[in-house]
UniProtKB/Swiss-Prot annotation:
Top-rank taxon, per record: Bacteria
Record-linked InterPro entries: rRNA_ssu_MeTfrase_G, SAM-dependent_MTases_sf
Catalytic activity: guanosine(527) in 16S rRNA + S-adenosyl-L-methionine = N(7)-methylguanosine(527) in 16S rRNA + S-adenosyl-L-homocysteine
Protein name: Ribosomal RNA small subunit methyltransferase G
HAMAP family according to UniProt: 16SrRNA_methyltr_G (MF_00074)
GO MF annotation terms: rRNA (guanine-N7-)-methyltransferase activity
Native organism: Paraburkholderia xenovorans (strain LB400)
């Protein structure tokens, strides 16, 4: 067993996750922490066959995927129970993480790649996430009352597209008083300048991701009604 593998077993990940959650100021139950670790194990297992992520090491999965996704929770949780659409969710990030830690929220994960939504559906089943829905298809083709039940309070993406494209493709799904939230690395000032008409940035939040030495930002975009 390599040093990397020794540091990537569940017993090694537990304190890393607990410390990260504490640093983010989140209060999670033992059951929620357990589900997050189960999710890492499931992602690592499926990734060997389906190439869901370029990250292979479970420890780095925990840091770069789970803790990265958790870093937005302190900024979303104050909204209260809401409906979320995670666009281009891939392996379920951040949507599955949000469904685990915000059980009173309803979360829909979306991707156009069937093998990815198959994994998301498996995650829903194995992790017992009754508040999670999985939708396969292009976001621009999803219609409230058809492919999805209604518009969403929160539309989020972690690695979907440039900001202007994300807004253009998803704005028809934003509920009244809702917003688009884009997870980015370095502050994307150029992307912000290219936002389409009727969309403006309300907040740019510098995120702290425990154990990750890299810039992360959360961009809140508000779109005009009917845009």
């Amino acid at each position: 067993m390599t040093v990397s593998q020794k540091g990537s077993g569940r017993e090694a990940l537990e304190p890393l996750l607990a410390d990260g959650v504490r640093e983010l100021g989140l209060a999670l139950s033992d059951a929620q922490l357990g589900k997050l670790l189960d999710y890492v194990a499931l992602l690592a297992k499926w990734n060997a066959v389906y190439n869901l992520t370029a990250i292979r090491d479970p420890r780095q999965m925990l840091i770069q995927h789970i803790l990265d996704s958790l870093s937005i929770v302190p900024h979303l949780a104050p909204l209260g129970p809401s409906s979320v659409l995670d666009v281009g969710s891939g392996g379920g990030l951040p949507g599955i993480v949000l469904a685990i830690v915000l059980p009173e929220w309803t979360v829909t994960v979306n991707d156009i790649v069937h093998k990815k939504t198959a994994f998301q559906a498996q995650g829903k089943a194995e992790l017992g996430l009754a508040n999670l829905s999985v939708v396969t298809g292009r976001v621009e083709s999803l219609q409230p009352g058809a492919e999805v039940p209604a518009k969403f309070d929160v539309i989020v993406s972690r690695a979907f597209a440039e900001l202007a494209d994300f807004v253009t493709l998803a704005r028809h799904l934003v509920a009244e008083q809702g917003a688009i939230w884009a997870m980015k690395g370095v502050r994307p000032d150029g992307e912000i300048e290219r936002l389409p008409a009727g969309a403006h940035v309300e907040q740019v939040i510098r995120l702290n991701v425990p154990s990750l030495d890299a810039e992360r930002h959360l961009i809140k975009v508000v779109v005009d009604a009917g845009g």
